[in-house]
């Protein structure tokens, strides 16, 4: 019943909206490890995966919560956190002598400036070689948090709205206007691991 002239049941992971098998096959045929980047509302995860018959093997992984342990005080789900997570993954990968990969964006749409491409840019800045197009990566101002700084400065006139919007930043002891400098400090710390 699963396959006949009228009806074909797709693979389970495709039905669940988890895997695009055609895209996966194309990535696996490259023979390189895959840089798998995934974003949720509050976190970013990046992994370098290698194919194995029994199941994919994780070579190196990084999570935005690791940034908090390194002293990051910003939000773990924004663009600067995605960039720093990619940078951390790239630094770990270069240490493990994994310098080439292909980006696996999964079922995410390829939107210019998306967090997945911020992870890619971080891995590239750490010294990895990953094929990409330069137009898809966000501007440097967005990767280091200048857009957050500009928004905080524009909101500064309304004290209540400012405190409400940036309460977690202020609670952790970071002024949102200082985010670009904070990102640069952490970038240096990661590259000197």
From Swiss-Prot:
Q: Which GO terms describe its molecular function?
A: 5S rRNA binding; structural constituent of ribosome
Q: Which InterPro entries match?
A: Rbsml_uL18_euk
- Record's GO cellular component terms: cytosolic large ribosomal subunit
Q: Which PANTHER family match?
A: LARGE RIBOSOMAL SUBUNIT PROTEIN UL18, RIBOSOMAL PROTEIN L5-RELATED
Function as written in the Swiss-Prot or TrEMBL entry: This is one of the proteins that bind and probably mediate the attachment of the 5S RNA into the large ribosomal subunit, where it forms part of the central protuberance.
Query: What family is it from?
Result: Belongs to the universal ribosomal protein uL18 family.
HAMAP family of this UniProt entry? Ribosomal_uL18_A
The UniProt subunit note reads as follows:
Part of the 50S ribosomal subunit. Contacts the 5S and 23S rRNAs.
Q: What is this protein called?
A: Large ribosomal subunit protein uL18
Q: Which gene encodes it?
A: rpl18
């Amino acid at each position: 019943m699963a396959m006949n002239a009228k009806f074909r049941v797709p693979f389970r992971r495709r039905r669940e909206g988890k895997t695009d098998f055609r895209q996966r096959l194309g990535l696996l045929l490259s023979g390189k490890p895959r840089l798998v980047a995934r974003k949720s509302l509050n976190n970013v995860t990046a992994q370098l995966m290698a194919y194995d018959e029994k199941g994919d093997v994780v070579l190196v992984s990084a999570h935005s919560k690791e940034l908090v342990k390194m002293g990051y005080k910003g939000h773990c789900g924004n663009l600067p956190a995605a960039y720093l997570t990619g940078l951390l993954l790239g630094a770990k990968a270069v240490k493990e002598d994994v310098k080439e990969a292909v980006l696996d964006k999964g079922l995410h749409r390829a939107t210019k400036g998306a967090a997945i491409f911020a992870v890619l840019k971080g891995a590239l800045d750490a010294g990895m070689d990953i094929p990409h197009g330069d137009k898809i990566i966000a501007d440097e101002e967005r990767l280091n948090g200048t857009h957050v700084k500009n928004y905080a400065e524009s909101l500064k006139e309304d004290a209540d709205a400012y405190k409400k919007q940036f309460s977690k930043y202020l609670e952790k002891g970071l002024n949102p206007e200082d985010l670009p400098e904070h990102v640069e400090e952490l970038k240096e710390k990661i590259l000197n691991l």
